[in-house]
């Protein structure tokens, strides 16, 4: 999923509505390829990579995108997609949303400003690896300049410290490459594997 978004960003495309509902499994089973859908809000950005339109699903939106709804002068970059990836990873690891929309606005805004660290408390997180928690926190970094890009996320130890998992993921991608779209599967340079 992160590699898919990395590919979009390499084409200067920001998805702007990454969420669980827009992810599909190619087939049943634990080892299925994830497919990204719903490009209705996707945007090709120009010089400087600046986006200014309030777009997306609020529960997954980065703070700088939410600010576009409140201020005329606010803008954001493709790193807003990285925030959404952090929300998705948080949900998959803990089974709950880091910044629930049903909270009063002031409480939700406070949680957003605090980022992920305070949201990763309790029993749900006690069994999650330090590397996974670190990646979630780095993706849910409030400051977009300090937030991980997709390239940086793919180089994170949570992805790179288990070569067998990486190799299985790369094999799955290669085995499931689509012959319909004519694109050749390309190995991400962040992954170093042996065939």
Model segments located where?
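C-terminal lobe of the eukaryotic/viral protein kinase catalytic domain
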Residues: 96-141
